[in-house]
Amino acid sequence: MTHRHVHPVRSRAGALSAAAVLFAAAGCASGTTAAPGDAAGGAGHGGTLVIGATGKLPNPDTVIGGAGFEGKRLVGFQIYEGLTRYELLKDTDRPPVVTGALAESWQVAADAKTWTFTLRKGVLFQDGTPFDADAVVFNLDRYLDKKSPEYTDALGAAAKEYAGSIASYRKTDADHVELVTKEPNGHFPEDLAHVLIASPTAVKKTGSANFSQHPVGTGPFAFSSQAEGKEIALVANKAYWRGAPRLDRLVVKSLPDAAARTAALRSGGVNWIEYPNPDDIDSLRADGVQIATNSYDHLWYWILDTAKAPWSDPRVRRAANYAIDRKAIAEKLLHGTADPAYQAAPRATAAYDPAGDTYSYDPAKARQLLAEAGLADGFSTSVTVPTGGSGNLLPVPIAEALQRDLAAVGIKVELRTTDWSTLIGAEAKGQVALGSDAIAQSTTLFQSEALLPLFIGSKSPFWTGHYANPQVDALLASASASPDRPKRQADHRKALSLVTQDAPWLFVVNDRNPRALSPKVEGLVQPQSWFLDLTTVRVRA
């Protein structure tokens, strides 16, 4: 049996009812919801779903680069699967749990590092290649073994985010693999939902460099064609192991401009848009368009460079947080499609405690804190803001509202705009795009739990804000090492409470994940998640 040891890779990567779909359109047909756990049903009856995305579309290799979680949601998790997956069709009043995908079960040894996965039998890649333990080892070699002919530095850097904890891996027999982590990792099964598995046959045929032109996985939809960065077309995988999806085809189009997305929906150019312009929601509803929302693990915020004065002073950071009117942004600018974020923990997470809501709108307190910090006359600063992209809502209008609020207490902000790919590309290198003092962005902290240390841990490759608190690092380490989920949640709650008090970020809003759907679209189940299971969706003729 071959046993693989991982060679180090330098990281550069960067309340609903249980079965309800939150379709709030008056006078139009409500969305049909599949019964939790039901197979999706046969393909060939569901039409073509055309989705207008908010950002540039991803490179559809298994690491799904350049488009954030929107690219993974709409493309990556449709073509590929990992050993595990999120259960997105059940319990939509709480964050989703991880269940088996290409692995049907797993066990962890007493050392809390050695994991044995029992693989699902009878699964085929979309090119007909059987899935087995050799396929798992092949893909891990591609990500982690610099001696593999299919390894590239780009793959290795991107895979580090979720596969970086793996020390070694091996096939024990055709249906089992053993993965050993460098340290105890209680959230390892969740990490593996993001370590996507490609067909070895397809990768060998094209080579890693060209695989994104002909990607092949085991997911519910198979690749058909693409116009790079602009449009990706997929077709139903009729041999999908969970049952063929109801749709015949899935097309994802890049439409970064919110007005263009709404126009495309009204004209019939698309029948689903991600993040409709909040100003358009009432008129869309009046036209019979369905608006789906749900709370999820989301935070829109500014990362402040705490290594630079005056953001190095926690009094200044707290002052900025008291200076902004989150409620006005959520209710007036975003028309209720987001909730105010008064603390670091997003509302739709186990780490959220209402008692931790801290930063009410209090300009007088903001001025007092600035005076205590010796900045009674205020100061000037800069922030880089994306013009759109994954989960970013209306980034420029939000930033302009924050700019006005901060100016009222003497903090003069220069806004510098760039595209989402440039911003996250710089962040993946631990840099701030355009040399600003802060960056604006959206993020998830818990999908998976591996992400939390990337954003608040002092050893993160994404250390753009240079925030460091030894107590936070210790709580993160304690949580990561524990297989006990309630203990991890308690540690995370304590860590984010400290982050709230330290205020290394400007906490703004928690998105409610709105999307607008044609009345002909049926069957969406909207979970408390960035991700979606599209197998239950169909489009009526």
Q: Which residues does each predicted region cover?
A:
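Aromatic- and charge-enriched surface segment that lines or borders ligand/interaction sites
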Residues: 104-149, 178, 310-312
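Structural transition elements
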Residues: 340-373, 390-397
